[in-house]
From Swiss-Prot:
Belongs to the universal ribosomal protein uL6 family. The gene is rplF. GO terms for biological process: cytoplasmic translation. Gene3D superfamilies: Ribosomal protein L6, alpha-beta domain. This is Large ribosomal subunit protein uL6. The keyword RNA-binding applies. The keyword Protein transport does not apply.
């Protein structure tokens, strides 16, 4: 039995979970999420909790067991609390502006980058160097944050670029002058 997969998921009062065919539908205060489930996994709702079991006992079913339990847990957490990732922009002249549904990032190049924010994601700016990405879908929040970060990854010499708030950048020492 999977150590993660065997744990039941408690359903809060404000959340409604439905299992229809191979779909798990989670509805809550913040919104609605849907997850497709493989045939080798069985999901049932009983006594105020979600239980994930596997039908088959092969290698793939064992792998999917823990995966789907984690995905459903993240869905329940997302519709109640939501998820957020924070990014910081470091560098002289590096800044971000929000206009409608787009972010405009000045990252040391001659032109600005325009990043269109997808549906289901909200972005908040704190000043012009802090970005907070929020939403109910953990995958989407992480994907949007990673796409914004990939526009200018932090470099190891001065740390210029876009980094996650909790990210530690390994710094390198620059070239030292040759002594004669």
């Amino acid at each position: 039995m999977s150590r993660i997969g065997r744990l039941p998921i408690k359903i809060p009062d404000a959340v409604k979970v439905d299992v229809k065919d191979n779909l798990v539908i989670v509805e809550g205060i913040r919104g609605r999420l849907v997850q497709d489930i493989k045939d080798s996994i069985n999901v049932k709702v009983e006594n105020g909790s979600v239980i994930v079991d596997r039908v088959l006992n092969d290698k793939k079913a064992k792998a999917y067991h823990g995966l789907y339990r984690s995905l459903i847990f993240n869905m329940v957490k997302g519709v109640t609390e939501g998820f957020s990732k924070s990014l910081t922009i470091n560098g002289i002249g590096y800044r971000v502006e929000q206009q409608g549904n787009s972010l405009f990032l000045s990252l040391g190049y001659s032109t600005q980058f325009e990043y269109v924010i997808p549906d289901g994601i909200s972005v908040k700016l704190d000043g012009n160097t802090k970005i907070s990405v929020e939403g109910i879908d953990k995958f989407k929040v992480g994907q949007v944050a990673a796409e914004i970060r990939s526009l200018k990854k932090p470099e190891p010499y001065k740390g210029k670029g876009i980094k996650y708030d909790n990210e530690v950048i390994r710094r390198k020492v620059g070239k030292s002058g040759v002594k004669k």
